[in-house]
A protein has these predicted regions:
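...captures the hydrophobic TM-helix bundle architecture rather than a specific catalytic motif
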Residues: 1-203
Length: 203
């Protein structure tokens, strides 16, 4: 019995330590494909709205309205929000998760302010008597800003989910692709709004 124990003690044991970085928090290859599909859908949707507005604007019953001034402040909100998302990405690349989470929180707050500002713009137009049924220009503003606002709301949901993962330590120096993908969508939503604002401002 002792000889067996001695023999077992002399068997070499090799332990392999996996030094590869953890990939559990990295999105799979399906995420970029899904993102591209979403962006393509958004672009086609607003391209159709753009064409409809251009055609409708040539009608004899087109009466332009003054875009509420709060809309320009809203534009500053959403542009600044995109800039702060880029700051968050850079903070993650430096390994500063707490700073990145702070930038994400500010970006979300500005997105919420943007939506509140759009509701104020609707209220201003309504108080001036420009309703969906009484003015075509105002109707397009309600429709386009409403559809766009729905996409902004969806983007805020994604950013909130991203922030929760960031606070849970899911992202690091080499593990923040999820943040990058969320930023791409948010930048797209911001660019679409600038396009719509220019389109609606040209009377």
């Amino acid at each position: 019995m002792n000889q067996v124990e001695v023999a077992l003690d002399t068997i070499p044991v090799h332990v392999t330590v996996n030094s590869e970085p953890r990939l559990s928090h990295r999105p799979s290859g399906l995420y970029p494909m899904f993102l591209l599909a979403v962006l393509a859908t958004v672009m086609m949707l607003f391209a159709a709205f753009t064409a409809a507005l251009i055609v409708r604007r040539t009608g004899s019953d087109w009466v332009p309205v003054q875009i509420p001034s709060v809309v320009w402040l809203n534009t500053v909100f959403i542009v600044t929000s995109s800039i702060l998302l880029e700051c968050a990405k850079k903070a993650f690349s430096r390994g500063s998760g707490s700073q990145a989470s702070l930038w994400l929180g500010y970006s979300i707050a500005l997105g919420v302010l943007f939506l509140i500002g759009q509701l104020i713009a609707w209220s201003v137009l309504n108080d001036q008597g420009f309703l969906l049924s009484t003015n075509t220009h105002a109707a397009f503003f309600y429709m386009l800003s409403g559809v766009h606002g729905a996409h902004v709301l969806g983007g805020i949901g994604v950013l909130v989910w991203t922030l929760r993962r960031a606070l849970a330590g899911a992202y690091g120096i080499d593990q923040y692709r999820g943040v990058a993908h969320a930023a791409i969508y948010w930048h797209c939503v911001g660019a679409v709004w600038i396009h719509l604002l220019v389109l609606l401002s040209i009377t």
